[in-house]
Amino acid sequence: MIKNLKINDGKATALISLSPSDMQPYDIPIFIDDESGDIQRESQIYPILDRVKSFFKRINIVGLIRDISIEINQACYEQSDYEPTELDNKELANDLKIVNITAYFDDLLFIYYSGSFLPDMEISAQITYEGELENLEIYDK
């Protein structure tokens, strides 16, 4: 699941292999941040890595992306009379790509990109290890 863990200049990076249903497995960069700014040994980040592994064993990544797409559509259409449909949510979910993940001890920060629907924007979703969305931001690249 987590591979190619490297520690350089006090920072830890790796790849996490995800395989959502109906899709080919793919690797996503993951940054591990213990908030010390000075990671020297793998053992410093074991607690975070354990939480990440547990999260991805429990969470349905397709369901998570679907939930994020609903939140994005609600945020995008909040100022209008248009109510996003299930098809809108499904199309956005199919287009969303996880660019990278940053893992902290308390939560995860997912960065998403939607080339068809929000090509000039970046989407960040702060997710707890229980799978709850804490914060969603959509901003210019």
Residue ranges of predicted features:
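Amphipathic protein-protein interaction modules
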Residues: 56-118
